[in-house]
């Protein structure tokens, strides 16, 4: 059973901002953090090594989407960093997903992005020319991801039950778009609270601004963690 902790999205522009944020947490507070494209491209692999040296788990969210051989080679590089989780785009197809799994190895969690939580059904149809419902598109990508033997998908909490019904109960569902009650939903169109997401079957949740922009990030994190574990 993989440990399930709320993942903090460290969507910062530079190394110093990240250090200042993490310094607000006790040294023995083991976190699970997400490092996205902005921070990784600004700092490079050093950012992963630094966060791992503090004893934290790292979800490196790069959403790789390229030809299978390139993705496989890139995953081999990421595996050497000691990351705990990373992402690819499900739209890359089964061959690319299988190549990603082979390159990364079996230990780190490998999940695929289905449809971004900022995507509406109208946007999907107009911009991606996918003429199904949003849920049908997500379920299609989830089934293809399971076929490629990845660990799970990134999805809205609203889609978790349906995804597990067409894959398996052990197929991981990581859900962004999580907001504590009474907070601004920002640019996320499909959101839930931590407790609601846990109740519906989410295995991991990702929370950013409600923690990183809180007056007291440590207190905000503990409140969200308590809600998740309630």
UniProtKB/Swiss-Prot annotation:
Residue ranges of the TM segments: none
Xref: InterPro entries: Aldolase_TIM (IPR013785), OMPdecase (IPR014732), OMPdecase_AS (IPR018089), OMPdecase_bac (IPR047596), OMPdeCOase_dom (IPR001754), RibuloseP-bd_barrel (IPR011060)
Active site: 63
A GO cellular component entry from the record: cytosol
GO molecular function: orotidine-5'-phosphate decarboxylase activity
Pfam families per record: OMPdecase
Biological process, per Gene Ontology: 'de novo' pyrimidine nucleobase biosynthetic process; 'de novo' UMP biosynthetic process
Entry binding sites for substrate: 11, 34, 61-70, 117, 179, 188, 208-209
Reaction it catalyzes: orotidine 5'-phosphate + H(+) = UMP + CO2
Pathway noted in the entry: Pyrimidine metabolism; UMP biosynthesis via de novo pathway; UMP from orotate: step 2/2
Keywords: Decarboxylase, Lyase, Pyrimidine biosynthesis
UniProt-listed Enzyme Commission number(s): 4.1.1.23
Enzyme class, UniProt record, top EC level: lyase
Family assignment from sequence similarity: Belongs to the OMP decarboxylase family. Type 1 subfamily.
Subunit (UniProt): Homodimer.
Task performed by this protein: Catalyzes the decarboxylation of orotidine 5'-monophosphate (OMP) to uridine 5'-monophosphate (UMP).
Protein known as: Orotidine 5'-phosphate decarboxylase
Species this protein is from: Streptococcus uberis (strain ATCC BAA-854 / 0140J)
Species classification: Bacteria, Bacillati, Bacillota, Bacilli, Lactobacillales
Gene: pyrF
